[in-house]
Amino acid sequence: MPDRRLFFALWLSDRQRELLRDTLRPVLTSVEGAVVDRRDWHVTLVFIGAFPDEQIPFLQAAAGEIEPEPIRLRFDRLDFWQRAKVATLMPRAVPPALEALVRSLEKTLEAFDVKAEDRLYRPHITVARRARNFETVPLTRPVDLEWQDFDLMESVSGPSGARYRPLKQ
């Protein structure tokens, strides 16, 4: 079987997507770029990359042993990332529970010979790609989102770009 492109993420519920959509609507009108379909909004925890299909059940079982603390993020601004040319919704701070979850996932992935990225973890939700440069936009009303769990996600390429879907056990 071929490899699949995977990552761990905090997947947004329909209610969370609607809340963000309503909050971002007035802000996104000032952003030039391709707005990401809200059905694909997520917070990446750890990028895995190409992963053997036959190993996925073992990865799911190993990740299933992790019991994360509840995670709460307060998103309060829209930032532009120059190198990636994306508009990202950013939280005010990174809670210890989120840092602990990322470390646990990275440790779990070591058993599968997946090395953690060597860069600072910055939780975010990408809301536009191929964006033009803009100044940071503070949200008039910060948005608090909470998660009790995380998902193993697959990135599936299609004619209109990548789409994301959770892989359920």
Task: Outline where the language-model segments fall.
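Histidine-dependent nucleotide/RNA phosphoesterase domain, centered on the 2H-phosphoesterase fold
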Residues: 1-169
